[in-house]
Every structure is written in C-alpha cells, then in structure tokens.
Amino acid sequence: MADDKDFPSADEYGRGLKGIGINLLVRDVPRSVAFAKDVLCAVAVTADKDFAVLQYRMGRSAAEWMLHADGTYHSNPMLGLLSDVSIRGAGAEIRLYDCDPDEAVARAKAGGYHVLQEPADKPHGLREAYILDPDGYCWVPGVPKRG
C-alpha cells in the first residue's frame, strides 16, 4: 500500500506528534486507505493491514490522520464502545478544507460510496458535501463558496 522503509518507529513517530490528532478505528485499513486516496486525494505515508498514516495537502491546507485496525486496540477501552455499533463516528464531522466537494462527490459516487449530502453553498461561507466512508465516518470536504 505504501512504502514505509523511511517511516519512523512507532515510538519516534508518537513522540513527534503535536497539536490535535485524529485516529480512526476501522474494520479494514486497506479499504479505508482506498477511500481516503480515491475520494479525498489523500496520500498514504505508511500503510499496512493494521495501521496507516494519511496526509492531505492542498493550497494552504494540510492534514494528517491515522487509521488503526480494530485488532490493534485489543487492550484499549475504545474497542469496547464499538462492539454493538454498525456506524462509527456518529455525531462527528471530519472536515477537510480546500478539498473540492463537487470533485470529491463525483469520486465517491464513482467508487460506490454513500453521499449523505450533495455539495451545497452554506451560510457559513463554505461549499461542502457530506460523504460516509466504509466505516460510517462522515467526511466533509469544503471550499470557500464563490461570490
């Protein structure tokens, strides 16, 4: 999926993290990486069947997030919260700015992903859409609306 020979060790990577982080627990890391690459135009910095680091860069925007397979969380209390949940991330929006919603929706539809809301101009100055990934996390690509 991604060549990670230059990626730091888990300990080294973890020590370098700053600010706020997003870590999504997913059932199938390769499937979620495919969604991020195909729909959001993200790049897999490193990825295997259990873990991935994804980056998105467009214009002045940059984002990085991690994916962990459920099995990697065997000792983590979060896994217990997901046992009876069919759609993950309910109530949370993961917003990706400077990601064209019209283009993202076209890619999502081509890939068979669920578009929750078509692109629309919103009163808060953005044009955005709502797209569900394979685990039900809601991604909101958005750009400043024209005019």
Language-model region placement:
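Conserved active-site tyrosine of GNAT-family acetyltransferases
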Residues: 32-37, 108, 133-136
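Generic non-transmembrane alpha-helix signal with a bias for helix starts/N-cap capping motifs
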Residues: 29-30, 101
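Short, surface-exposed ligand-recognition loops at beta-strand->loop->(often short) alpha-helix junctions
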Residues: 24-28
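Vicinal oxygen chelate
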Residues: 2-23, 43-99, 103-132, 143-147
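Major-groove DNA-recognition helix of helix-turn-helix-type DNA-binding domains
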Residues: 40
